[in-house]
Each structure stands twice: as C-alpha cells, then as structure tokens.
C-alpha cells in the first residue's frame, strides 16, 4: 500500500532473497535454503518457513533492488495502453503482461513448473505457497497466469511446451520431506 511505502520500515510476509540480510541463526533453525529448488520459488518457500518459525521479515523502504525476470521489451504504445486498460478494467494484473514482449527461457519455465508442485507438497500442512507470484490462488490460476502466457509468448514454443511438461512430471514425481515447525521451540 502507499502508506506502507511511505514508512521507512515495514514488516512483510515475503521478500526476494537477493540483497536480503538474513540472520544465520534463523537460516539454520528453519532448515536453510532448499537447494533442490535451485532457482524459482526459493524465496517463497524460505520466507514461509521463516515466518512459521516465529521470525519476522523487515523491509527497509529506503533501498531498492531493480531486478527483472528475463528480458522484457515494451510493445507499441497502443498495445501497451490496451493491455494495461484491460488489466485495470478486470482488476487482474496478469493481463498487463501482454503489454510487453518477454523472452521466455525454457529452463526457467521448467523450474517454475517443477517447483510450484514440489513446494506445495513440502509445505502442504501450512497452506498454498508460490501462487502469489503469479497473481493467483491455486494451481488452476497458475495454469492461466503462468503456463499459458509462457507458451503464447515464447519464441521457441516447442521448447517451452517440453519444459512445461517436464517440469510438471518432475514436480509430480518429487517426494519432498514434509516440513514442520519444530514443536516446543520458539525461535524469535
């Protein structure tokens, strides 16, 4: 919210781990980063474990990290205005994605599809995880907001379709250990 951004510090539920300062003690007690995730949803999964373990995430609004997910090129001004208006009219940020051209990496598509399944298996005792990245609440919304746009916007559609399928299969085959808060311990 605007009020939150005007404050110098605000507690939040989730952050990216790039440029974050993490307590080594908290990191160890929560089980460290899950290296199997490798790239996508590492932040969501770790932040959820941090909060469930009683720690808080503090955002300092005086600092900004400008980070992009892939190479993004704006479309014509007319197309930008159209898709941004559709997004605003329907109150759905996913439509705004069509206002720019994105170079879709099949490798990132693979990990995103694999990891959304894996992370939700691992954290299923504590509710859904990772869908907030894609402005949706569950797997069906993820299909509409991530999978389909990734394929439609891909330069190499065959590679992205294969990456999507392989990610789903590997995520479904994954068997992560269920994470649980260590009972009786209050860390923070």
Q: What residue ranges belong to the model's regions?
A:
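A short, conserved alpha-helix in the catalytic core of glycosyltransferases
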Residues: 20, 26-31, 36-69
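Short, contiguous clusters of charged residues that form electrostatic/catalytic patches at enzyme active sites
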Residues: 25, 45, 114, 118
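Short, conserved alpha-helical segments within structured domains
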Residues: 42-43, 135-140, 184
């Amino acid at each position: 919210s605007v009020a939150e951004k005007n404050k110098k510090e605000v507690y939040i539920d989730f952050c990216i781990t790039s440029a974050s300062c993490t307590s080594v003690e908290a990191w160890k007690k929560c089980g460290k980063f899950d290296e199997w995730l490798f790239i996508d949803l590492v932040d969501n999964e770790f932040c959820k474990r941090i909060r469930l373990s009683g720690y808080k995430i503090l955002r300092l609004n005086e600092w900004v990290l400008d980070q992009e997910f892939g190479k993004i090129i704006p479309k014509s001004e007319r197309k930008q205005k159209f898709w941004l208006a559709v997004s605003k009219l329907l109150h759905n940020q996913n439509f705004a994605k069509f206002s720019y051209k994105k170079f879709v990496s099949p490798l990132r598509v693979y990990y995103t599809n694999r990891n959304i399944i894996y992370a939700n298996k691992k954290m299923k005792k504590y509710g859904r995880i990772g869908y907030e990245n894609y402005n949706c609440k569950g797997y069906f919304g993820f299909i509409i907001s991530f999978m389909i746009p990734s394929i439609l916007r891909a330069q190499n559609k065959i590679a992205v379709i294969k990456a999507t399928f392989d990610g789903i299969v590997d995520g479904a085959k994954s068997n992560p250990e269920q994470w649980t808060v260590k009972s009786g311990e209050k860390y923070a």
